[in-house]
Amino acid sequence: MNIRPIEDADLLEVQRVAQVTWLHAYKEIYPEKAILTFLSQAYSLDRLRDLLRTDSNKLRRLFYVVATEDGIVGYGELVERGFAEYELTRIYLLPEFQGKGMGKRLLNQLINDVYPLRQMFAWVEKENGGGRSFYESMQFHVEEEIEDNFFGTVTHLLKYVREWE
């Protein structure tokens, strides 16, 4: 397993991983049409190329992939939101690679590659039990709950926060 910054050659595989993981994680929460609409926007090749260019400066965004002999099996993105404050905007692994410590290794790599780090947060769908368990196992706690609208579906998001001194 190799955790590294995303490269242009990874974009199609990241799209594939996004489609599989989003349908797996959210199929019981959101309508499939909403998920597919989101994926077509957030994971279009143009959007991913924009993220790749932004990532190249390594100052405000880290976008890493988890690569194995099977190809790209996961990815994570960390975005600076303020001094020493970062939002984990996405972290996903293919279902067959979950529960093997890869997500923890990916998150720890992202954490290790930013300095200074005072606070990290992530918005998690309240109904996403697997996601919630992951963040809780990584010492995040719920700080806030908001109501959101995901392509016509009313949903509740939890803000998970972890702080460092």
Regions found by a protein language model. Give the residues of each.
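Extreme N-terminal starter segment of soluble prokaryotic enzymes
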Residues: M1-I3
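Acetyl-CoA-dependent GNAT
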Residues: P5-A9, R16-E96, L107-D113, D148, ...
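Conserved glycine-rich acetyl-CoA-binding loop
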Residues: G71, R90-N108, E125-S133, S137-M138
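Conserved GNAT acetyl-CoA-binding A-motif
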Residues: V114-V124
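Terminal substrate-recognition subdomain of acyl/acetyltransferases
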Residues: L157-E165
